[in-house]
Amino acid sequence: MILNNIAKTILFNPLSKDVNELYIVSGYATPTMLSWYIKNLYHKTQAPIRIYLLVGMVPFDGISVSVHEGFIHLMQDELPPEIERLECSYIYDAPAVHSNLFIWAKDGSPVLAFAGSANFV
């Protein structure tokens, strides 16, 4: 169980491995968290990474216009050299997904994964 330095353990330490993709399935997520992560990747990657974010609780709670527009804005912004691709999508049909998974991969093959209660917020 990870109790301390959760962001460092899940989002940054795996960058030292041979990975180039991060798949995030989160019940809840915010553009603020995604923006924070993008900014904090500065000089931390060995090669550009691809980030795929799937927000799961939208069928249950919906998504506010401001949050949706925040994700759109981030996807339209110019990406830093540390990020090759950024995708954000929502589950919109029931059942909602409350899982929180962080999967690091190399060219589509899983390398390391974390599951737990930490949303991407």
Label each PLM-derived region with a short phrase.
Residues M1-V121:
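PLD/PLD-like phosphodiesterase catalytic module centered on the HKD motif
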